[in-house]
């Protein structure tokens, strides 16, 4: 089979300013360049059959071609998109953004023709170069095709190839370049990009002083990058920059990116300095929105802990907002756990924080896309939103439309399999629904570790005897105190005496559903949810009005709840029995419960039960 014909003269045409060609070239050599903490960069010596040039640089998103031996010495490829980058010393680098291997190296015997090194900057381009290189003779149909009509490349030409020039403060001019071409060796550059994420101003104080900062993430057609403004620049730019707006960014400092806490796909990150300018851009229709690289939920189990990644899923259900205190700064923040499911039927527990947690509404089961969530192994596999993450509800992207269509047509009756909890794991999301009969017939709790399940059941009996006790009043201690009979109460754990105490609840309850019953132990929060009163009030009621105290327990009987239960086989005095503990008690979501019953009926009907 004939080899593809090389685009003779293409190198000369590219360096002469032809940005529309799609030349067919041969790889003569590949050299890896160490970039420190970032991924390797590959420098290519390429031939067009007439000349060779060693100034081709492979974009990092194409590294897989070399890593998988698809791109190797002697192979023939077509470069469909590239960027010419001018360095400070006058040299030019051609960054290959898109390419296709047309003929693998093992099918090409060696170097084609007798090409000579191209002398960049030494006189005019060689006359042998045809123009344009991308328009081969009709007799060679295997060669590269003609460039597309200009209208098809309007956005790219407008951004980069068209050579847009921006006036920066001070009267200087700077040419707009793509984000993908930025590197620390450039001095003058401008990018036109959309801000996709903006963090709040954060402050710090240490032995070296104090300061403030905020970070943004921006994207253009070629890629994305993270930028940070410190101190004076933070004050200068914070109110100016808005999410989803497009700006011209000029003259920042570029350095190797720290990828520990961000999923931005760029080897470098930007820092604003005293010369940085940010100018709003009104003509922004062709600048893309957030760029995602979604990882299917089913693949999370094979990813490393602490990986920062993008995820999309339908919100199956959402827990209520809770308040937690961050130990490092003693600051109280909002927290909400939601469960996301994709078309694989896999479910992952995801934690939202702060404003994202407060404002989230999962009642209509929205599509949730998160850019930059961190993966943990707490309770199987779970995700947590970072301060640098972007959370989008029902985003206007094809993946969201596809997921919504799947869920509305068939996904809403899929129960889902959680990867955030496994048999023997910790209590994960609100999944693993079981009837009480299934819990016993499946011998849940008989393994080496505890099992967790969720069930809808009804209170049939509450054991009110000894359900209240007097506990240590210290905030972090719930140990029972001993009445010293002198007006003081002693806590053996704290080794202190107190003039007061607090009431705590340990309530034994018998619950039942349509097929079985189960004794469970309910501690403070769960017991208060069932009784509808807090422990302090119940303690006072028991001391002052025994009849009213009894009525609280009577009124709590025969009420139904959704129980989250931990079961484990435990041994006391050589006798083994299942201990069931209520981890959470919530009112029944009858809409969700009815949906699940309908789903089960359909499953049974399909199985002919």
Swiss-Prot record:
The keyword Endoplasmic reticulum does not apply. It holds the Pfam family Rep_fac-A_C. The keyword Transferase does not apply. Residues 124-151 have a biased composition (Pro residues). It comes from the Eukaryota. Its main location: nucleus. GO terms for biological process: DNA recombination; DNA repair; DNA replication; protein localization to chromosome. SUPFAM superfamilies: Nucleic acid-binding proteins. Residues 189-273 bind DNA. A zinc finger (C4-type) spans 472-494. InterPro entries: Euk_RPA1_DBD_C (IPR047192), NA-bd_OB-fold (IPR012340), NA-bd_OB_tRNA (IPR004365), Rep_factor-A_C (IPR013955), Rep_factor-A_N (IPR007199), REPA_OB_2 (IPR031657), Rfa1 (IPR004591). CDD domains: RPA1_DBD_A, RPA1_DBD_B, RPA1_DBD_C, RPA1N. It is found in: Nucleus; Nucleus, PML body. GO terms for molecular function: damaged DNA binding; single-stranded DNA binding; zinc ion binding. GO terms for cellular component: DNA replication factor A complex; nucleus; PML body. Belongs to the replication factor A protein 1 family. PANTHER family: OS03G0429900 PROTEIN (PTHR47165:SF4). As part of the heterotrimeric replication protein A complex (RPA/RP-A), binds and stabilizes single-stranded DNA intermediates, that form during DNA replication or upon DNA stress. It prevents their reannealing and in parallel, recruits and activates different proteins and complexes involved in DNA metabolism. Thereby, it plays an essential role both in DNA replication and the cellular response to DNA damage. This is Replication protein A 70 kDa DNA-binding subunit. It comes from Xenopus tropicalis. The lineage of its organism: Eukaryota, Metazoa, Chordata, Craniata, Vertebrata.
């Amino acid at each position: 089979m004939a080899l593809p014909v090389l685009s003779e003269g293409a190198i000369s045409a590219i360096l002469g300013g032809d940005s529309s060609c799609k030349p067919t070239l041969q790889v003569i050599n590949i050299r890896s360049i160490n970039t420190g903490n970032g991924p390797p960069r590959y420098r290519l010596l390429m031939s067009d059959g007439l000349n060779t040039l060693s100034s081709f640089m492979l974009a990092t998103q194409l590294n897989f071609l070399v890593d998988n031996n698809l791109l190797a010495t002697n192979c023939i490829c077509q470069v469909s998109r590239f960027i010419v980058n001018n360095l400070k010393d006058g040299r030019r680098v051609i960054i290959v953004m898109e390419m296709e291997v047309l003929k693998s190296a093992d099918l090409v015997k060696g170097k084609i023709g007798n090409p000579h090194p191209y002398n960049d900057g030494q006189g005019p381009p060689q006359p042998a170069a045809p123009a344009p290189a991308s328009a081969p003779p009709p007799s060679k149909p295997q060669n590269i095709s003609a460039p597309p009509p200009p209208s098809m490349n309007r956005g790219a030409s407008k951004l980069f190839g068209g050579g847009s020039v921006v006036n920066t403060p001070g009267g200087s001019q700077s040419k707009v370049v793509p984000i993908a071409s930025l590197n620390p060796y450039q001095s003058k550059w401008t990018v036109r990009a959309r801000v996709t994420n903006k963090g709040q101003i954060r402050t710090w104080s240490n032995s070296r002083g104090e300061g403030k900062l905020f970070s943004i993430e921006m994207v253009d057609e070629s890629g994305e990058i993270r930028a940070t403004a410190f101190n004076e620049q933070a004050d200068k730019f914070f109110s100016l920059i808005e999410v989803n707006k497009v700006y011209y960014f000029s003259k920042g400092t570029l350095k190797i990116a720290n990828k520990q806490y961000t999923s931005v796909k760029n080897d470098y990150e930007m820092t604003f300095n005293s010369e940085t300018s940010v100018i709003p851009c009104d003509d922004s229709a062709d600048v893309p929105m957030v760029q995602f690289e979604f990882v299917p939920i089913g693949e999370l189990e094979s990813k490393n802990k602490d990986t920062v990644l993008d995820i999309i899923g339908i919100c199956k259900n959402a827990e209520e907002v809770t308040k937690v205190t961050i130990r490092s700064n003693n600051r109280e923040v909002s927290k909400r756990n939601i469960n996301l499911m994709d078309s694989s039927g896999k479910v992952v527990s995801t934690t939202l924080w702060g404003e994202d947690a407060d404002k989230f509404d999962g009642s209509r089961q929205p599509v949730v896309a998160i850019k930059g969530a961190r993966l943990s192994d707490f309770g199987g596999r779970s995700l947590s939103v970072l301060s640098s993450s972007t959370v989008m509800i029902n985003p206007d992207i094809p993946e969201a439309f596809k997921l919504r269509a799947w869920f509305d047509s068939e996904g809403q009756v899929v129960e889902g399999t959680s990867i955030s909890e496994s048999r023997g794991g910790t209590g994960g999301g609100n999944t693993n629904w079981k009837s009480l009969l299934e819990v016993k017939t499946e011998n849940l709790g008989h393994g080496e570790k505890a099992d967790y399940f969720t069930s809808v059941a009804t209170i049939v009996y509450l054991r009110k005897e000894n359900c209240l006790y007097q506990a240590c009043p210290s905030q972090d201690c719930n140990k029972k105190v001993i009445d010293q009979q002198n007006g003081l109460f002693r806590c053996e754990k704290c080794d202190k005496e107190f003039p007061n105490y607090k009431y705590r609840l340990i309530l034994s309850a018998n619950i039942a559903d349509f097929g079985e019953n189960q004794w469970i132990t309910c501690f403070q929060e769960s017991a208060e949810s069932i009784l509808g009163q807090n422990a302090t009030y119940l303690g006072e009621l028991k001391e002052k009005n025994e009849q009213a105290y009894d009525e609280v327990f009577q009124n709590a009987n025969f009420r139904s709840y959704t129980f989250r239960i931990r079961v484990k086989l435990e041994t006391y005095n050589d006798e083994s029995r299942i201990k069931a503990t209520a981890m959470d008690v919530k009112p029944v979501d009858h809409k969700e419960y009815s949906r699940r019953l309908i789903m089960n009926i359909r499953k049974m009907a399909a199985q002919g039960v």
